[in-house]
Regions:
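Short gly/pro/ser/thr-enriched loop/turn and capping motifs at secondary-structure boundaries
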Residues: 21-22, 44-45, 188-194, 211-215
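Active-site-proximal loop->helix
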Residues: 22-31, 194-199, 218-220
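Bateman/CBS regulatory modules and CBS-like beta-alpha motifs in cytosolic regions of diverse proteins
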Residues: 37-69, 81, 87, 116-129, ...
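A short, polar/charged loop-to-alpha-helix boundary motif
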Residues: 93-109
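Long, charge-dense
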Residues: 106, 199-229
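Extracellular/luminal Protease-associated
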Residues: 134-198, 202-207
Length: 238
Protein backbone atom coordinates (compact mmCIF):
# COMPACT_ATOMS: atom_id res chain seq x y z
CA UNK A 1 0.00 0.00 0.00
CA UNK A 2 2.87 2.37 0.83
CA UNK A 3 4.54 1.69 -2.53
CA UNK A 4 1.26 2.16 -4.44
CA UNK A 5 0.69 5.47 -2.66
CA UNK A 6 4.14 6.65 -3.74
CA UNK A 7 3.63 5.62 -7.36
CA UNK A 8 0.15 6.98 -8.03
CA UNK A 9 -2.41 9.59 -7.12
CA UNK A 10 -4.96 7.18 -5.63
CA UNK A 11 -4.93 6.43 -1.91
CA UNK A 12 -4.39 2.83 -0.79
CA UNK A 13 -4.95 1.33 2.67
CA UNK A 14 -3.30 -1.95 3.75
CA UNK A 15 -5.72 -4.78 4.57
CA UNK A 16 -5.52 -8.54 5.00
CA UNK A 17 -8.02 -11.29 4.04
CA UNK A 18 -6.98 -13.91 6.60
CA UNK A 19 -4.57 -14.95 9.34
CA UNK A 20 -1.02 -13.57 9.18
CA UNK A 21 1.55 -16.20 8.21
CA UNK A 22 4.81 -16.65 10.13
CA UNK A 23 6.81 -15.17 7.26
CA UNK A 24 4.61 -12.08 7.08
CA UNK A 25 4.70 -11.74 10.87
CA UNK A 26 8.51 -11.70 10.77
CA UNK A 27 8.56 -8.92 8.14
CA UNK A 28 5.98 -6.81 10.01
CA UNK A 29 7.85 -7.13 13.30
CA UNK A 30 11.23 -6.46 11.69
CA UNK A 31 10.05 -3.19 10.16
CA UNK A 32 7.85 -2.37 13.17
CA UNK A 33 4.70 -2.14 11.04
CA UNK A 34 1.23 -2.54 12.57
CA UNK A 35 -0.89 -5.49 11.50
CA UNK A 36 -3.19 -4.65 8.55
CA UNK A 37 -6.88 -4.56 9.39
CA UNK A 38 -8.78 -7.80 8.71
CA UNK A 39 -11.38 -7.87 5.94
CA UNK A 40 -13.87 -10.76 6.11
CA UNK A 41 -15.62 -10.09 2.79
CA UNK A 42 -13.88 -9.20 -0.47
CA UNK A 43 -16.93 -9.59 -2.71
CA UNK A 44 -17.44 -6.99 -5.41
CA UNK A 45 -19.81 -4.14 -4.66
CA UNK A 46 -22.06 -2.43 -7.17
CA UNK A 47 -19.83 0.66 -7.09
CA UNK A 48 -16.91 -1.52 -8.22
CA UNK A 49 -18.73 -2.86 -11.29
CA UNK A 50 -18.55 -1.22 -14.69
CA UNK A 51 -22.14 -0.94 -15.92
CA UNK A 52 -22.84 -0.87 -19.65
CA UNK A 53 -26.18 0.63 -20.62
CA UNK A 54 -27.86 -1.48 -23.31
CA UNK A 55 -31.13 -0.59 -25.00
CA UNK A 56 -33.99 -3.03 -24.47
CA UNK A 57 -35.23 -5.28 -27.27
CA UNK A 58 -38.70 -6.61 -28.07
CA UNK A 59 -39.67 -10.12 -27.01
CA UNK A 60 -40.97 -10.69 -30.55
CA UNK A 61 -37.63 -10.44 -32.38
CA UNK A 62 -36.07 -13.63 -33.67
CA UNK A 63 -33.27 -15.60 -32.06
CA UNK A 64 -31.11 -14.82 -35.08
CA UNK A 65 -31.65 -11.08 -34.73
CA UNK A 66 -30.91 -11.24 -30.99
CA UNK A 67 -27.68 -13.11 -31.70
CA UNK A 68 -26.64 -10.60 -34.36
CA UNK A 69 -27.37 -7.74 -31.92
CA UNK A 70 -25.19 -9.39 -29.27
CA UNK A 71 -22.30 -9.71 -31.72
CA UNK A 72 -22.70 -6.12 -32.89
CA UNK A 73 -22.72 -4.73 -29.33
CA UNK A 74 -20.14 -7.26 -28.06
CA UNK A 75 -22.38 -8.38 -25.18
CA UNK A 76 -23.65 -11.73 -23.92
CA UNK A 77 -26.87 -10.45 -22.34
CA UNK A 78 -29.72 -8.34 -23.70
CA UNK A 79 -32.58 -6.83 -21.66
CA UNK A 80 -36.07 -7.54 -23.01
CA UNK A 81 -38.55 -4.71 -22.46
CA UNK A 82 -42.15 -3.96 -23.36
CA UNK A 83 -43.42 -0.89 -25.21
CA UNK A 84 -43.32 1.14 -22.00
CA UNK A 85 -39.69 0.27 -21.39
CA UNK A 86 -40.49 -2.05 -18.46
CA UNK A 87 -38.18 -5.04 -18.07
CA UNK A 88 -39.79 -8.36 -19.03
CA UNK A 89 -36.71 -10.56 -18.88
CA UNK A 90 -33.23 -11.12 -20.27
CA UNK A 91 -31.87 -13.25 -23.09
CA UNK A 92 -28.32 -14.59 -22.86
CA UNK A 93 -26.14 -16.59 -25.22
CA UNK A 94 -26.86 -19.75 -23.23
CA UNK A 95 -30.59 -19.35 -23.91
CA UNK A 96 -29.93 -19.13 -27.65
CA UNK A 97 -27.64 -22.16 -27.57
CA UNK A 98 -30.31 -24.12 -25.68
CA UNK A 99 -32.89 -23.31 -28.37
CA UNK A 100 -30.70 -25.04 -30.98
CA UNK A 101 -30.81 -28.29 -29.00
CA UNK A 102 -34.59 -28.71 -29.39
CA UNK A 103 -34.36 -29.99 -32.97
CA UNK A 104 -36.55 -33.10 -32.69
CA UNK A 105 -39.91 -31.36 -32.40
CA UNK A 106 -41.20 -30.42 -35.85
CA UNK A 107 -44.00 -28.37 -34.28
CA UNK A 108 -41.74 -26.13 -32.21
CA UNK A 109 -42.18 -23.16 -34.59
CA UNK A 110 -45.96 -23.19 -34.28
CA UNK A 111 -45.78 -23.72 -30.51
CA UNK A 112 -43.63 -20.58 -30.32
CA UNK A 113 -46.19 -18.68 -32.47
CA UNK A 114 -43.53 -17.58 -34.94
CA UNK A 115 -44.31 -14.66 -37.21
CA UNK A 116 -43.90 -15.29 -40.94
CA UNK A 117 -42.03 -12.01 -41.20
CA UNK A 118 -39.41 -13.41 -38.78
CA UNK A 119 -39.10 -16.58 -40.85
CA UNK A 120 -38.54 -14.64 -44.08
CA UNK A 121 -35.99 -12.38 -42.37
CA UNK A 122 -34.08 -15.33 -40.93
CA UNK A 123 -33.92 -17.01 -44.34
CA UNK A 124 -32.98 -13.77 -46.12
CA UNK A 125 -36.12 -14.33 -48.14
CA UNK A 126 -39.16 -12.50 -49.49
CA UNK A 127 -42.85 -13.02 -48.86
CA UNK A 128 -44.58 -13.05 -52.25
CA UNK A 129 -48.03 -14.21 -51.13
CA UNK A 130 -50.09 -14.05 -47.96
CA UNK A 131 -49.92 -11.84 -44.88
CA UNK A 132 -46.36 -11.28 -43.61
CA UNK A 133 -47.70 -10.07 -40.25
CA UNK A 134 -49.57 -13.32 -39.59
CA UNK A 135 -48.24 -16.03 -37.26
CA UNK A 136 -47.53 -19.73 -37.72
CA UNK A 137 -49.62 -21.09 -34.85
CA UNK A 138 -50.60 -24.63 -35.92
CA UNK A 139 -49.02 -27.45 -37.83
CA UNK A 140 -45.56 -28.90 -38.31
CA UNK A 141 -42.60 -28.09 -40.55
CA UNK A 142 -42.25 -30.57 -43.42
CA UNK A 143 -39.50 -30.98 -46.00
CA UNK A 144 -41.52 -31.89 -49.09
CA UNK A 145 -40.64 -34.38 -51.81
CA UNK A 146 -41.40 -34.47 -55.51
CA UNK A 147 -43.64 -37.51 -54.98
CA UNK A 148 -47.23 -36.24 -55.07
CA UNK A 149 -48.50 -39.34 -53.30
CA UNK A 150 -46.12 -38.76 -50.40
CA UNK A 151 -47.23 -35.14 -50.10
CA UNK A 152 -50.91 -36.03 -50.02
CA UNK A 153 -50.31 -38.64 -47.34
CA UNK A 154 -47.89 -36.74 -45.12
CA UNK A 155 -48.92 -33.08 -45.32
CA UNK A 156 -51.73 -31.99 -43.02
CA UNK A 157 -53.74 -28.79 -42.89
CA UNK A 158 -51.80 -25.78 -41.54
CA UNK A 159 -48.39 -27.38 -42.11
CA UNK A 160 -45.38 -25.37 -43.31
CA UNK A 161 -43.79 -27.06 -46.31
CA UNK A 162 -40.27 -26.60 -47.71
CA UNK A 163 -40.37 -27.26 -51.45
CA UNK A 164 -38.46 -26.97 -54.71
CA UNK A 165 -39.54 -25.38 -58.00
CA UNK A 166 -42.05 -28.03 -59.20
CA UNK A 167 -45.35 -26.26 -59.85
CA UNK A 168 -47.50 -29.38 -59.47
CA UNK A 169 -45.95 -30.14 -56.08
CA UNK A 170 -46.59 -26.58 -54.88
CA UNK A 171 -50.21 -26.83 -56.02
CA UNK A 172 -50.64 -30.15 -54.21
CA UNK A 173 -49.36 -28.53 -51.00
CA UNK A 174 -51.92 -25.74 -51.43
CA UNK A 175 -54.67 -28.29 -52.04
CA UNK A 176 -53.64 -29.93 -48.76
CA UNK A 177 -54.26 -26.55 -47.05
CA UNK A 178 -50.68 -25.82 -46.09
CA UNK A 179 -50.41 -22.54 -44.19
CA UNK A 180 -46.99 -21.67 -45.63
CA UNK A 181 -44.79 -22.78 -48.52
CA UNK A 182 -41.06 -22.05 -48.56
CA UNK A 183 -39.41 -22.27 -51.98
CA UNK A 184 -35.63 -22.54 -51.87
CA UNK A 185 -32.64 -21.91 -54.15
CA UNK A 186 -34.11 -18.62 -55.38
CA UNK A 187 -36.56 -20.37 -57.73
CA UNK A 188 -39.36 -18.24 -59.13
CA UNK A 189 -42.94 -19.18 -58.35
CA UNK A 190 -45.55 -19.40 -61.09
CA UNK A 191 -48.17 -16.59 -60.96
CA UNK A 192 -50.91 -19.23 -60.91
CA UNK A 193 -49.49 -20.67 -57.69
CA UNK A 194 -49.21 -17.18 -56.15
CA UNK A 195 -52.82 -16.41 -57.05
CA UNK A 196 -54.01 -19.69 -55.58
CA UNK A 197 -52.01 -19.07 -52.39
CA UNK A 198 -53.55 -15.63 -51.90
CA UNK A 199 -57.04 -17.11 -52.26
CA UNK A 200 -56.23 -19.71 -49.62
CA UNK A 201 -54.46 -17.23 -47.29
CA UNK A 202 -51.29 -19.28 -47.64
CA UNK A 203 -47.95 -17.53 -47.19
CA UNK A 204 -45.26 -18.17 -49.80
CA UNK A 205 -41.64 -17.35 -48.93
CA UNK A 206 -38.83 -17.51 -51.47
CA UNK A 207 -35.24 -17.77 -50.26
CA UNK A 208 -31.82 -18.16 -51.89
CA UNK A 209 -30.92 -20.98 -49.47
CA UNK A 210 -31.11 -24.67 -50.35
CA UNK A 211 -33.30 -27.17 -48.53
CA UNK A 212 -30.61 -28.24 -46.07
CA UNK A 213 -29.77 -24.66 -45.11
CA UNK A 214 -33.46 -23.77 -44.72
CA UNK A 215 -34.04 -26.71 -42.38
CA UNK A 216 -30.94 -25.75 -40.37
CA UNK A 217 -31.74 -22.04 -40.08
CA UNK A 218 -35.50 -21.97 -39.70
CA UNK A 219 -35.56 -22.56 -35.93
CA UNK A 220 -33.59 -19.33 -35.50
CA UNK A 221 -36.73 -17.45 -36.55
CA UNK A 222 -38.55 -18.23 -33.30
CA UNK A 223 -39.26 -15.26 -31.00
CA UNK A 224 -36.96 -14.86 -28.02
CA UNK A 225 -39.94 -14.68 -25.64
CA UNK A 226 -40.02 -18.49 -25.64
CA UNK A 227 -36.44 -18.76 -24.39
CA UNK A 228 -35.67 -15.65 -22.34
CA UNK A 229 -35.29 -15.73 -18.54
CA UNK A 230 -38.24 -14.11 -16.78
CA UNK A 231 -37.97 -15.17 -13.14
CA UNK A 232 -35.51 -14.72 -10.27
CA UNK A 233 -34.05 -11.53 -11.72
CA UNK A 234 -32.40 -9.06 -9.33
CA UNK A 235 -33.23 -5.54 -10.53
CA UNK A 236 -32.49 -2.03 -9.30
CA UNK A 237 -32.68 1.58 -10.48
CA UNK A 238 -29.60 3.76 -10.95
Amino acid sequence: AYLKNQLGERQYVPKRAGAISEETRYVLDYFKVEDPELITDVGAQLKDISIRKTAGISSQISLKKAWETMKKLDVVTLPVTNRLGKLEGVIVTKDIATSYMDVYDNRVLSKARTQYKNIAETLDGNIIAGNEHAYFIRGKVVVGASDLGFLSEYIEADDMVILGPQKEVQIRALESNASCIIVGCGFEVDPEVIQMANKKDCVIITTPYDTFSIARLINQSMPIKEFMTREHLVTFDI
